Every structure is written in C-alpha cells, then in structure tokens.
Amino acid sequence: MSLDSRLPAFRNLSPAARLDHIGQLLGLSHDDVSLLANAGALPMDIANGMIENVIGTFELPYAVASNFQINGRDVLVPLVVEEPSIVAAASYMAKLARANGGFTTSSSAPLMHAQVQIVGIQDPLNARLSLLRRKDEIIELANRKDQLLNSLGGGCRDIEVHTFADTPRGPMLVAHLIVDVRDAMGANTVNTMAEAVAPLMEAITGGQVRLRILSNLADLRLARAQVRITPQQLETAEFSGEAVIEGILDAYAFAAVDPYRAATHNKGIMNGIDPLIVATGNDWRAVEAGAHAYACRSGHYGSLTTWEKDNNGHLVGTLEMPMPVGLVGGATKTHPLAQLSLRILGVKTAQALAEIAVAVGLAQNLGAMRALATEGIQRGHMALHARNIAVVAGARGDEVDWVARQLVEYHDVRADRAVALLKQKRGQ
C-alpha cells in the first residue's frame, strides 16, 4: 500500500490521536508506538555508553512534517526540534510543491575525504609526484583496513595530493584519500584508513605526518533538490503571486551578495535539515560545518539555494550541498528513536536520506522567503510561538490555546501578557 503524506486537520488532533493515526498509517508496531508515547525512549545504559559523564537524558519535541512528495514518492518526515513554525512551514511548502509534482532530488556517490598532513618536506612538488606514483600501493593499504566496506562495494577509490608551499610553518603536503563509505557517515572509516597509510606516506616523502583526519567539507558527496511553484500557488489576500515571486527573487539576490543576510538565509535552510539529522541520529555538527564551508566555495559566503523564474513565470528553487549522513554506525544504530525515524522515512540508503534532507531544507527556505516577501517573518512565526509563551507562563491543557489566541488577537505575544491573561482566566 502506498503512503499518502497528506494529513488533513492533523494539527487539530491531540498528540495521542496524532500518534495513533501515524501508527496506523505506517503500520508501526506496538513497541514503536510506545517508544514515542512514553518518556525514556533512550535507556540510561545506552546513553551511558554513548558519551561520557552521563547523568540523565534530555528530550525534545518529535514531530512529523506532512505533504512531502519526493521523486514521486510520498514521505512523512520526522523532525526533532524546539523552535515553533518550522514543522508548519515545511509542511505547507510541501503542500504547495506537490501540486506540481513535489520535489525532484538526486545525489552523487557517498565519497568522503580523509586528509593526511605531511610536514618537514623541502621539495613539496617532487614529494607529491612520489606519492602519486605509488597511488595504487597506498589505496591497497587503505583498503586492507576495512574488508567489510570493500565487500559492500565501497572502499578507497583514489588519492589527491595538494601542495602548500608557503604556510606559517613552512611547506607542507596534504594527501586526500577519496573513500566511498556506502551507507555510513564514514568518519571512523576514513580516519582509520588515514592512520593506516601514514607510515607509508612518511617513507615515500621523507616528511613527518601530523594530522590524519576526515574533512567535513564533503564536496564530493552532494545532494540536490529542486522545486517549481506557480504564481497562483503563492498569491495571498494582499499580494498577487507574481508580486510574491518578485519579492522572493529580491530576497534571494540579497542573500547571494551579502554575507550578513546569507548567514541568516542559510540558517533558515538548516532549520529544516538539522531536525531531520537529529531525528535520525546523525551528526548535525558535521552537516552544518560542511554546509557553511560549501557556501564559501567561491571565496565569498553566499546562499546555498538558488531561485529564478522560468519561461512560464514559475518560481524555480534549487538546493545543492554536502550531505554526509549515514544509516549505520553511531547514534543512528544505538538510539531507538533514530532507528524508528528511519523506518518512518522508509529509506534504504544513505543517499535517499540525504535527498530527503535537502528537500526539507529547500521547503524551509521557500517558507521563510515567502513570509519575508509578504507579511514579514514575525506574523506567522509569532502566532505559533504564542503557544510556547503560554506554556512558559504556566498554561496547561485547554488554557494553552486560549491564552495563545488572546496573545495573537491583540498582537502582544509577550510572557508578562500571557501571565496576566492566565490569571484573568483563572479568576485570580
């Protein structure tokens, strides 16, 4: 049975009713549903094995974004995040996108760089040539360290050698092992290979190896998403669709040329991506580092997305960025909710997960720019933030929605106002 990711009136249900609906829709087991329904999904013994000095666990809201259709397949997207409006915006933009076939995605092979720094070299150019002449020997040695990866079709594929003739510490070489890590994020794999080949590289060059470490600029491991939106889909009561498109294009141009704006623009993209990375137990710091480094690849920090108008006057958005995520290893395997997230997504490869991530990032970027180009970011965001303010003020149950409605109606979304409203409702 194919999944329909549209969830009409889903937000009006209670959390328990939402979970029941998702459980039935996806055919989740009783144990899966219990993981989400009850606190303590991460047992203390597992948490204690993940990091050091554990004294407890920390919970964040776990939601699903609806309406996503990616390469013709409907997907419910688990998102773990504390900020209001992210899930709503992504879901609404996905609803607009699906009217034109949803998101189209693709990705390159899961190739990661392992860097080996070699210092103390008097003739870097000749040392570089010496390494390249013995490339096959180096690759063969690296691949001896992970026979399982080789059996799965992965392994070290190539080496590159970069020379830096003038550094604060004199000339140096940096060799890159190019490793196909298959469905792993790949950090441990490539680090092990880098350490394995270090003695051989020292012998070949006569230099001294210092750092042996992966690079988080995974610019060979790219994922891409594209979306097309018609003017009719973007029109509001106050703005024509054409006017909204022009506003979005101006907003994009701002991010393309101004790093101050680009930083916030790209943060909005990561608002969609990071919650999925967290939900699947992947390393969101690695994804963030790669994203912002990639945004500087031209020598100027700019927008990760591009937006343009096609010959039919439709808005076309594209996001291409590094996406080093995995399905095996680390918290992805140890955290029970990370495993459940992968089952909800229905992904079988790391590349499929990467493509969903960039689709969500593109949707989030569209939502932010649409708001900025029309009503401003605060109107919609603060309406959703009002519920959070109500909870902070002490509202419970039905009080939350009542206080939030009052805050929004009078355009006064502040904690002290929420406290006053709550006292009023309780007759205090």
Swiss-Prot record:
Q: Where does the record locate the signal sequence feature?
A: none
- One Pfam family linked to the record: HMG-CoA_red
Reactions performed catalytically: (R)-mevalonate + 2 NAD(+) + CoA = (3S)-3-hydroxy-3-methylglutaryl-CoA + 2 NADH + 2 H(+)
EC nos: 1.1.1.88
According to the UniProt entry, the coiled-coil residues are none
* Key words, A-Z: NAD, Oxidoreductase
Could you say which enzyme class this protein belongs to? Answer: oxidoreductase
This protein's pathway: Metabolic intermediate metabolism; (R)-mevalonate degradation; (S)-3-hydroxy-3-methylglutaryl-CoA from (R)-mevalonate: step 1/1
* Record's keyword annotation contains NAD: yes
Q: What does this protein do?
A: P.mevalonii can use mevalonate as sole carbon source. With this enzyme mevalonate is deacetylated to HMG-CoA.
Subunit structure as annotated in this protein's UniProt entry: Homotetramer.
Family affiliation = Belongs to the HMG-CoA reductase family.
NCBIfam families, per the entry: HMG_CoA_R_NAD
Q: What is this protein called?
A: 3-hydroxy-3-methylglutaryl-coenzyme A reductase
Which lineage do the record's taxonomy fields give for this organism? Bacteria, Pseudomonadati, Pseudomonadota, Gammaproteobacteria, Pseudomonadales
Could you tell me the gene encoding this protein?
mvaA
